[in-house]
Amino acid sequence: MSMLKGAANGLASAISFGLIPLFTLPVLSGGMSMDSLICYRFSLAALFVAILMLIKKESFRITKSDVPLLILVAIFYDISSLFLLWAYDFLGSGLATILHFTYPILTTLIMMAFFKEKASWPKIVAILMAVAGVAVLSIQKGGNVSLAGVAIAVLSGLGYASYMVSINVSSRIKNLKGLKLTFYVFLIGDLFLIANSYITGTGIQPINGTSDIVNLLLLVIVCTIISNQTLIVSIKNIGSVRASVLGAMEPVTAVVVGLLVFGESLTVKSAIGMLIILAAVVIIILSGNRKGEI
């Protein structure tokens, strides 16, 4: 029963993450800037998480030494979120999400380069496959795929990989309760985005009508609150490895949304590149299961 519960929650988490384009693209097409959209997303998410913390009677207290680390983590999360939305402009939501999903590969590369994680043949094969997959997507006949878009999408994955590594290698951050960490990442990230919007002179744009309100609320509830909570349930029931493998449904969902809702095209070559990257990600996740983690 716990296996079924974990698998169901893992799929729900991945699919809800993959629905991000469904709620963000209509708001962006209505004229809202990326900074403003993410500001609203983070503000509402921080509010919802704060309410959950109050209901659970969890403390908001952090120490002074936590602040610099939380700022670093929030900056990485900001970079990841902004660059992913930026990549949508160049590649479409499906392809951009697939390239963003290289983050497990990039996480492994960071750990090997800076934290002396041992290389293994499965990891090396997965990294080479990921590079090959990105190359297949980048080198399209007739120049149908933007190289700038590919770079931006991969940088969004690098931002998320850096976010994950900074949490894992810092014992202080790692020991913060999940809701508290989530709250401060959203809050600090939001403050940086607000400051940046006024420094650049764009400011925070107003919400344009009921449809934007609905999309922003669904973005927060479905793609932030539900996705994170179901992921936690999944990990507790089936372990992080299996939950991570189920996470491959995230880019698949984004591709389906792009095709069915936004009319994005998918060539055979693009599909092959996507499958190579997904296979590489599954290999890199399973290669961490050296001690039988389930």
Model-predicted segments: where are they?
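Transmembrane alpha-helices of multi-pass small-molecule transport proteins
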Residues: 29-79, 106-107, 159-166, 182-201, ...
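Glycine-/small-residue-enriched transmembrane alpha-helix faces in small-molecule transporters
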Residues: 1-36, 40, 75, 79, ...
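Helix-helix packing/entry segments at the starts of transmembrane helices
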Residues: 8, 14-15, 40, 96-102, ...
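Specific transmembrane alpha-helical segments of multi-pass solute transporters/efflux pumps
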Residues: 16, 21, 52-96, 100, ...
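Membrane-interface helix-cap regions at the ends of transmembrane helices
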Residues: 45-63, 131-145, 188-212, 256-260, ...
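Specific alpha-helical transmembrane segments that line the substrate/conduction pathway
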Residues: 36-38, 42-44, 76-77, 85-118, ...
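Juxtamembrane helix-entry segments on the extracytoplasmic side of multipass membrane proteins
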Residues: 2-7, 31-39, 62-68, 139-159, ...
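Hydrophobic transmembrane alpha-helices of multi-pass small-molecule transport proteins
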Residues: 49, 71, 110, 119-139, ...
